[in-house]
């Protein structure tokens, strides 16, 4: 283990001991905000220090076994103990490296998932609907909550554009690598000659901004228009101007919401999506220079980058960022994304570990 890493782990062990002392004091709950902060830090440090204690025990076992090598009658036993201790230390060190990786501050946030039909006309819109169903089925498996924010349906079904809010533990950390271009290759239902068509959609995954002032939006920078909602909804939907369009003048970002009969609720939803889009824009501008100097395999979130191909005739899905091909497309389209997401997370961790190694 590198000296810098061991020094860091020693510091965390000392800090955990301090937290144990602070949390054992009688008046610890006098300041509830401080108490919550301390318990959260304790919960984060506990597993790391526990793993480090196991690593130190393995190192101690190796040292003890080394001393037995001089005794011929104990040599075989000692060599087995040394080998076992070193294997344990290597495994624990890898786990500790992952635990020490810098955390994405957005990982625990809820998200807005936006899917837009791209090239391919009606077939692209139909595929946007298929992608939405895939993500909704995945969210259902995670027991996350889903709320429709905005939708623009196409004539033959599917969506020209759809935005949903997904709320649940780890929503952003699990879905953040979905941003980018998704290409589909299949025979459309309208194709009479049986020819395979290629079309595409773009997906954007945006962390939800905090309720209180995380993204400052000056009301003077907003243009808010109301209009009559279109599409399904019966006669009532055409009687009032319940649909809302919010334009953020400095950035040109436009959000429309018309899914609710209440103009107030539509405006509230539109402002939430707008805040997330502004936050997302700021994030990508902030990381543009970094991305230019060190091209990351995944996590760039560039909407124009084609990240994945879904080939229906061959029953395969290929993620181009990590060269992963899975021949289980039906299960994937039904929301079974664990293997795919796990591979992306593992690759991302490997990139972070490599960058930390370069820094050392």
From Swiss-Prot:
SMART domains: PCRF. Methylated by PrmC. Methylation increases the termination efficiency of RF1. One of its GO terms (molecular function) is translation release factor activity, codon specific. The keyword Oxidoreductase does not apply. Keywords: Cytoplasm, Methylation, Protein biosynthesis. One of its GO terms (cellular component) is cytoplasm. It is found in: Cytoplasm. The modification N5-methylglutamine is found at residue 235. HAMAP family: Rel_fac_1. Belongs to the prokaryotic/mitochondrial release factor family. Peptide chain release factor 1 directs the termination of translation in response to the peptide chain termination codons UAG and UAA. This is Peptide chain release factor 1.
